[in-house]
Amino acid sequence: MSLERALARLTGVPMSTHAPKTRESEEACPVYPHPVVPRLVLEVHRKNNALVGSNTPKMSVMGHLDIACLREHVKSRLSSPNFVGFTVVCLVEHEDMVTHIDLHPHVFQERVCLLRPTSPGITELCCLLSMLENCRDMSPTFLRSIICRARKTHERTPGMDAAFVMHGIETLTATAAFVYELSVDDHFRATPLVMFKLHKAIGDASTPMGGLMKPIYLESFKLESSGENEDDKQTCADPVNIFYCDTIFTKHLENNEVLKYLKMCTLFKPPIVSLFSK
């Protein structure tokens, strides 16, 4: 809430106008109760002797989500022996600074997971989140169809993992609607990420306000190279390729340190079936 107040002071716009429409019952009972969001979700596959991490491709027909294609995509992932899992980075809201991640390397490394769900529902939600993060031509119709499909899938998929990924979809949907000024005509169950709202309010770094404010509020240099070690050398030696679409949600993948730890995760961390397993 304090970040919301700071944003209101910077922009001169009351807090209420920044908040998306929510129903009181949904606001009182959020999908996931903590300010942590799953980010940088990529599908990881093994191809010959290489690992490939790539975004879920956009599946659309007449501007809407192609549900039949999505079902087949999920089935193929669950049945493929070459599918390794999804990369998932767990970030607290204020740590996601749009173009920077406000975490030291040793902490960020622990936040990167390789999730290999066995449930079709969780797999589908991960695909939808990856698709949402990497969608370059966002439209109200497509955004609405993603959130509607995700909610239906979440309703029949119990567990904390489904709730957590659904929270990410709700949050990024609200954020995309705010950033791109899309009229989705729906009640969101999460609020836009505050740092993304601040990024939009401040404006481009070439403007006087952006040039002054962005280094203060939206830059962090914690995630920098700390020197090469044996894991780094092994990461460079093993072929791991990362593919993604350039959107406001994937700016972190331009950071070499982020890429390094994602690759290390795919190489050295065993896949887990749940982010909440003990």
Curated annotation (Swiss-Prot):
| Residue ranges crossing the lipid bilayer per the database entry | none
Where does it sit, as one GO cellular component term?
host cell Golgi apparatus
Keywords assigned: Host cytoplasm, Host Golgi apparatus, Virion, Virion tegument
Main location class = virion
Q: Does the keyword DNA-binding apply?
A: no
Location comes to:
Virion; Virion tegument; Host cytoplasm; Host Golgi apparatus
Concerning its family, UniProt says: Belongs to the herpesviridae cytoplasmic envelopment protein 1 family.
Functionally, this protein is described as follows:
Plays a critical role in cytoplasmic virus egress. Participates in the final step of tegumentation and envelope acquisition within the host cytoplasm.
Q: What is this protein called?
A: Cytoplasmic envelopment protein 1
Question: Which organism is this protein's natural source?
Answer: Human herpesvirus 8 type P (isolate GK18) (HHV-8)
